[in-house]
Amino acid sequence: EQETKGMIAAYDDLLSINYFGEWRKAYWTERYTDILDAVGAAFFDRKEVLARAETLDGDLFQKAMAFGGEDYAFLCCLSYRHSIAAHKLVTDENGEVIFLSKENDSNGCIGTVDVSYPSVPLFLLYQTEYVKGMLRPLFRFAACDVWEYDFAPHDVGRYPYAWGQVYGLNKDNRKGDFSGESGDVFPPFYMY
C-alpha cells in the first residue's frame, strides 16, 4: 500500500503593508487568528482544497487551450501561480480590497503598474475585485497633492511601504517618457 507524505511551509508577516501611513494585516487574518490556524484549516480541508485547485487548473488549461493551443495552455498554467504570488492582498480602512504588486527582482517597488498590468487578464477571468484592488492605490496616490503630473504613477512606494512613490517625487527622474505607465493603466481602468 502506498503512503503519501507532504510538507507545509508558511510564513506570518504579522503586519503586511504600510498603506498610506497605516499598517494593514494580510487579508487572510480576517478569517484566521494566526498562521498556524490558517495552515491547520488548509491541512484539515486538504482534499477539498486540492480538488478545488485541480478544478481551477483544469478550467484554466481548457480555456487557454481553446485560445492558443497546448503550449500556450501549459505556459498559462505555469505562470498564473507566479502572477498571484507577485501580489499582496490587504484591505484598506474602508474594508475595500487592495491588491499590491511587488517587484521582486529590481528595487522593490510596490503597486507597480508594469508588474500588475500583465496579470490583469487572469484576474478579469477569475476575480475582478483584484483588478479594482490594483487600481485603488494608484488612484489614491495620483489624487495626492504631491502628485503633480498628468500621467499615471509608476508605483505607490517601496515594499512594504505603500505611501509614496520611488520615481515620481524626484523631479530629476521625470525627464523621460512615462507614457508606458499611463498606457498600462488604461485597459484595467476601462474595466474598472
Name the predicted role of every residue range:
Residues 12-14, 125, 190-192:
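Short, glycine-/Ser/Thr-/acidic-enriched flexible segments
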Residues 72, 76-77, 115, 182-185:
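Short runs of predominantly hydrophobic/aromatic residues within well-ordered alpha helices
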Residues 1-111, 128, 132, 139-144:
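Acidic/polar, glycine-enriched structural segments that form the non-catalytic walls/loops
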Residues 130-192:
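Helix-terminus loop motifs that line ligand-binding clefts
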Residues 99-115, 166-181:
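Solvent-exposed loop and edge beta-strand segments that line ligand/cofactor-binding
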